Swiss-Prot record:
This is Proton/sodium-glutamate symport protein. Homotrimer. The chain crosses the membrane at residues 4-24, 44-64, 78-98, 149-169, 199-219, 223-243, 245-265, 307-327, 331-351, 352-372. It comes from Geobacillus stearothermophilus (Bacillus stearothermophilus). InterPro entries: Na-dicarboxylate_symporter (IPR001991), Na-dicarboxylate_symporter_CS (IPR018107), Na:dicarbo_symporter_sf (IPR036458).
Length: 421
């Protein structure tokens, strides 16, 4: 009998979670029994993310060993991220203006959700200016950054350490071998943890549906439909078009990442798939030096799905309150989002925090966020899947742009996937 693939196992877990959550809607015991299972799975993934990023980056950077090359890669990567996320904001604004998801919605029929925790987080984040964000990329204490899980300082330290390993030549070989062994061991651990993914997905979805139910979607169904349709458009038209420019088939990327996309969608967490997408992009022909730098950095600077949603949600709230947003005000919103949406990965409820930091500056009532907080998890699932595709594509594009993409390895990997399908 043929073994059921991981994608199908996760999908079955997703469906069963929805069924259990719907049957026991409003029953707090669902969270009591299932939340620990979901939390254990998320903790297992978070446990391995930092060791994989550090070991992969050190090995990748040490193999390049050239500060000038790395600086060139970093510059190109940031430019690419800025262009794509700006396009995502524009697409979100256009979708909100064309489909008007907030027009005609009766605010009295909507439930308000407490957003105080997001407000507190936003107040903390707003104390940091853009300059401070860049200053904080350089860690004053790497162990403090490791404890907090601050990805950008960890990436900076790993790059510098990798350059140091390369610079000392023969003396650095034992260190390099240690990190190579660490990376391989952690990828093995990742594969073992992924066997637990269907159970984690079942638990997390079961808890979500039991808390919010399907009824919470009905008053805001137009917003949900517009968000999902716009995300699909962005994947196949925008990212698909960019991929085609570089000779990449977007459907190949989706096929490669099918397991990870279902998992990221179900858990609404990009972190759960970071190790696997790095591994798969290497198998697809991207060098370790590029995947280990571009993908983790993209988690802070290239959240395409999140930035698209933030623009759309901002206009939705304005429409909800009957506020007319002229072009000049929408351009201001675009410029503010270009800044506020960068560099705060790892902050809980990052999209909400960005929106809270943005709405007030363009004259939109932040209280409106309380109306969509209840369905944020459903919307978060869609934007997470888009973030995963966007960052995976970025790694391939940077590899091609740098002339380091292994075309033959990529073709062999696709052929191998087609045979096993």
């Amino acid at each position: 009998m043929r073994k059921i693939g991981l994608a199908w196992q996760i999908f079955i877990g997703l469906i069963l979670g929805i069924i259990v959550g719907a049957i026991f809607y409003g029953n707090p015991k669902v969270a009591t029994y299932l939340q620990p299972i979901g939390d254990i799975f998320l903790r297992l993934i978070k446990m391995i993310v930092i060791p994989i990023v550090i070991s992969s980056l050190v090995v990748g950077v040490a193999s390049v060993g050239d500060l000038k090359k790395l600086g060139k890669l970093g510059g190109k990567t940031i430019i690419y991220f800025e262009i794509i996320t700006t396009i995502a904001i524009v697409v979100g604004l256009l979708a909100a203006n064309i489909f008007q998801p907030g027009t005609g919605v009766n605010m009295k029929s909507l439930e308000k959700t407490d957003i105080q925790s997001y407000v507190d987080t936003t107040n903390e984040v707003q104390h940091h200016s853009m300059v401070e964000t860049f200053v904080n990329i350089v860690p004053k204490n790497i162990f403090e950054s490791l404890t907090k899980g601050d990805m950008l300082p960890i990436i900076f330290f790993s790059v510098m350490f990798g350059l140091g390993v390369a610079a000392i030549g023969e003396k650095g070989k034992p260190v390099l071998q240690f990190f190579q062994g660490t990376a391989e061991a952690m990828f093995y651990v990742t594969n073992q943890i992924m066997k637990f993914a269907p159970f984690g997905v079942f638990a997390l979805i079961g808890v979500t549906v039991s808390k919010f139910g399907v009824e919470s979607l009905i008053p805001l169904s137009k917003l949900v439909i517009v968000v999902y349709a716009t995300m699909v458009f962005f994947i196949f038209v925008v990212l698909g078009g960019v991929a085609k420019l570089f000779g990449i088939n977007i459907f190949h990327i989706i096929k490669i990442l099918k397991d990870e996309l279902i998992l990221a969608y179900s858990t609404a967490s990009s972190e759960t798939v970071l190790p696997k997408i790095m591994e798969k992009m290497e198998n697809f022909g991207c060098p370790k030096a590029i995947t280990s730098f571009v993908i983790p950095t993209g988690y802070s600077f290239n959240l395409d799905g999140s930035t698209l949603y933030q623009a759309l949600a901002a206009i939705f709230i304005a429409q909800l309150y009957g506020i007319d947003m002229p072009i000049s005000q929408q351009i201001s919103l675009l410029l503010v989002l270009m800044v506020t949406s960068k560099g705060i990965a790892g902050v809980p409820g990052v999209s909400f925090v960005v929106l809270l930091a943005t709405l007030g500056t363009v004259g939109i009532p932040i209280e409106g966020l309380a109306f969509i907080a209840g369905i944020d998890r459903i919307l978060d699932m869609a934007r997470t899947a888009v973030n995963v595709i966007g960052n995976s594509l970025a790694a391939i594009i940077m590899s091609k742009w740098e002339g380091q993409y292994n075309e033959e390895k990529g073709k062999q990997y696709i052929a191998q996937l087609q045979q096993s399908a």
